[in-house]
Curated annotation (Swiss-Prot):
GO terms for biological process: argininosuccinate metabolic process; L-arginine biosynthetic process; urea cycle. PROSITE patterns: ARGININOSUCCIN_SYN_1, ARGININOSUCCIN_SYN_2. Homotetramer. NCBIfam families: argG, PRK00509.1. The gene is argG. It is an enzyme of class 6 (ligase). Gene3D superfamilies: Argininosuccinate synthetase, chain A, domain 2 (3.90.1260.10), HUPs (3.40.50.620), Single helix bin (1.20.5.470). This is Argininosuccinate synthase. It comes from Aquifex aeolicus (strain VF5). One of its GO terms (molecular function) is argininosuccinate synthase activity. InterPro entries: Arginosuc_syn_C (IPR048268), Arginosuc_syn_N (IPR048267), Arginosuc_synth (IPR001518), Arginosuc_synth_CS (IPR018223), Arginosuc_synth_type_1_subfam (IPR023434), AS_cat/multimer_dom_body (IPR024074), Rossmann-like_a/b/a_fold (IPR014729). It catalyses: L-citrulline + L-aspartate + ATP = 2-(N(omega)-L-arginino)succinate + AMP + diphosphate + H(+). GO terms for cellular component: cytoplasm. Pathway: Amino-acid biosynthesis; L-arginine biosynthesis; L-arginine from L-ornithine and carbamoyl phosphate: step 2/3. ATP binds at residues 9-17, 35, 116.
């Protein structure tokens, strides 16, 4: 009898490592798929780890530039932060991975694709909605939703029993998801929202207390909304600029986020994120937009786009006309976003200290209070009178006049 074939989204972490063995014991033929979206050095161990766990084949694909160009950049252009804080580090990679799972399922005639998401997490929605949008006939398996393990400690014991190497231990039971855009960390002592995160939970950022005592200045250059220069050096590959900025900002403790967020399934979850490069780029791009956009467009953009874009990414709606429409809007805005932004990094903080653009709408002669002032202040008097007319009428009515 022919075995059922499944393409598994494989990170090499605790959950997906034991999923390989678990599916194999259930009679599945497992092919693992790993997208290199900037996980770092750990990726070199992935194929051997997958085969040791029972996979018949392990696919690793370099998608760093695809991830940077087609996922990180559009999200940056939207200034998307879920609930005003989370830069969507893990969430952004899910539709890309799902797209490749579908590709390889079709290529290898697999009956199923599988992921390692839990029944109370967000990723189950992101993976499955993306797969269905691309190929509604493919069935999705989620072993974590139905297997027998009740705790992370039991999973660690299972992995140790089958000699499956994983980083998680009973002493350090973190679940870590890392890519080019940042790191997501949860579980273990982090589940108590009152307790400060242990320093060993952080992966790519220095503790602000131990960061350099001198600030470091960086300059990010944009061309039509795309960061292409870092400190005067041009980057033809977007992922390399982000990676270098991660290293620079990370050593200054920039980009640490500790938040309680609202998951899709209705629960609140304490999450730790590290996104040094992303947070520097967000700060820089927002400031550049404030320089080059008129007030009406800038205010509309800030009021609507960041929230709506973050929401659709978080909720697994990447492959929708809504996302395409919002991309069209942000791409139009980006046509004006050429210029440089200078930022100061110091002990966990990032602040803009300078900006310039050939499309700048800042006119010094209108803004200055010096003798160069060209603003017609008499016009200001009449403007104020017209602008305040509704309140003047309101005041008269309330006073009965």
């Amino acid at each position: 009898m022919k075995k059922k074939r499944v393409i598994l989204a494989y990170s090499g972490g605790l959950d997906t490592s034991i999923i390989v063995r678990w599916l194999t014991e259930k009679g599945y033929e497992v092919i693992t798929y790993t997208a290199d979206v900037g996980q770092g050095e750990e990726l070199s161990e992935i194929p051997e780890k997958a085969r040791r766990a029972g996979a018949i084949e392990a696919i690793v694909e370099d998608l760093k530039e695809t991830f940077a160009e087609n996922y990180c950049l559009p999200t940056l252009r939207a200034l998307a932060l879920y609930e005003g804080k989370y830069p969507l580090t893990a969430a952004l990679s899910r539709p890309l991975i799902a797209e490749r799972l579908v590709y390889y399922a079709e290529k290898f005639n697999a009956d199923y694709v599988a992921h390692g998401s839990t029944g109370k997490g967000n990723d189950q929605v992101r993976f499955e909605l993306s797969v269905w949008a691309l190929n509604p006939d493919i069935e999705v398996l989620a072993p974590v939703r139905e297997w027998e393990f009740k705790s992370r400690e039991e999973q660690v014991e299972y992995a140790q029993r089958f000699n499956i190497p994983v980083k998680a231990t009973k002493e350090k039971p973190y679940s870590i998801d890392r890519n080019l855009w940042g790191v997501s960390i949860e579980c273990g002592p982090l589940e108590d929202p009152w307790q400060e995160p242990p320093q060993d939970a952080y992966q790519i950022t220095q503790s602000p207390e131990e960061a350099p005592d001198e600030p470091e200045y960086v300059t990010v250059g944009f061309e039509k909304g795309k960061p292409v220069y870092l400190n005067g050096e041009r980057y033809e590959e977007q992922w390399k600029l982000i990676a270098n900025l991660n290293e620079i900002a990370g050593r200054h403790g920039v980009g640490r986020i500790d938040m309680v967020e609202n998951r899709l399934v209705g629960i609140k979850s304490r999450e730790i994120y590290e996104a040094p490069g992303a947070m520097v780029l967000y700060e820089a791009y927002r400031d550049l937009l404030s320089l080059v956009l008129d007030r009406f467009t800038f205010h509309y953009f800030l009021t609507h786009i960041p929230h709506e874009y973050a929401k659709l990414v978080y909720e697994g709606l990447w492959f929708t006309p809504l996302r395409e429409a919002l991309d069209a809007f942000t791409n139009k805005i980006a046509e004006f976003a050429t210029g440089e932004v200078r930022l100061k990094l110091y002990k966990g903080s990032v602040s803009v200290v300078g900006r310039r653009s050939p499309n700048s709408l800042y006119v010094e002669e209108l803004a200055t209070y010096s003798e160069k002032d060209q603003f017609d202040q008499i016009a200001g008097k009449h403007f104020t009178k017209v602008w305040g007319l509704p309140l003047k009428v309101l005041g008269r009515v309330r006073k009965g006049k």
